[in-house]
């Protein structure tokens, strides 16, 4: 997808997280399955990643958005290492999922997402993200200046950054 939102760069910060929201909503509509989101944008089902999302901002402020949903893979399609962390809709639901229906639903959800982004009205998307974020209320590992640390994930801020509390009780926001 090559959306051209024509917005200032700072307004485009949440696009990757919003794409995760769109995937969750599309899967719910088509399959009835509620996905979780692992911050910042990994749709999760059955504790495993079900989708990959990549976003690139070009110099002209166009957004290149790539979304790959694991729809029909079976266990033989994943290497043992990948099978530990990834799954497919078919594997988790035990039935086939229409790729055409899912693609149509995803395009509709992305269209709604861009309308909300252009209007500056992300409150509903942020509330949904907070509801399905699997990191909130848990301890997370963060790589900061080459050093791993642990912190408690406590919230998602208005730009979809992860708000954490470190071992000393200090709050900070992590950006992807």
Task: State what each model feature region is.
Residues 10, 15, 80-82, 157, ...:
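Short, solvent-exposed amphipathic alpha-helical segments in soluble enzyme
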Residues 53, 67-69, 152-154:
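A short, well-structured catalytic beta-strand-centered motif of the EAL phosphodiesterase domain
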Residues 104-176:
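Glycine-rich, charge-dense phosphate/pyrophosphate-binding loop(s)
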């Amino acid at each position: 997808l090559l959306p051209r939102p024509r917005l200032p760069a700072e307004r485009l910060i949440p696009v990757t997280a919003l794409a995760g929201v769109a995937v969750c909503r599309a899967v719910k509509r088509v399959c009835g399955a509620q996905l979780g989101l692992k911050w910042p944008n990994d749709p999760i089902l059955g504790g495993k990643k079900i989708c990959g999302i990549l976003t690139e901002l070009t110099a002209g402020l166009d957004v290149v958005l790539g979304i790959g949903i694991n729809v029909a893979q079976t266990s033989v399609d994943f290497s043992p290492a990948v099978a530990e962390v990834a799954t497919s809709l078919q594997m988790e639901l035990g039935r086939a999922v229409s790729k055409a229906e899912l693609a149509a639903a995803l395009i509709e959800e992305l269209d709604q997402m861009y309308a909300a982004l252009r209007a500056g009205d992300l409150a509903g998307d942020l509330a949904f993200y907070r509801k399905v974020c699997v990191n909130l209320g848990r301890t997370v590992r963060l790589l900061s200046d080459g050093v791993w640390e642990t912190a408690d994930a406590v919230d998602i801020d208005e730009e979809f950054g992860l708000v954490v509390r470190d071992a000393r009780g200090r709050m900070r926001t992590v950006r992807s």
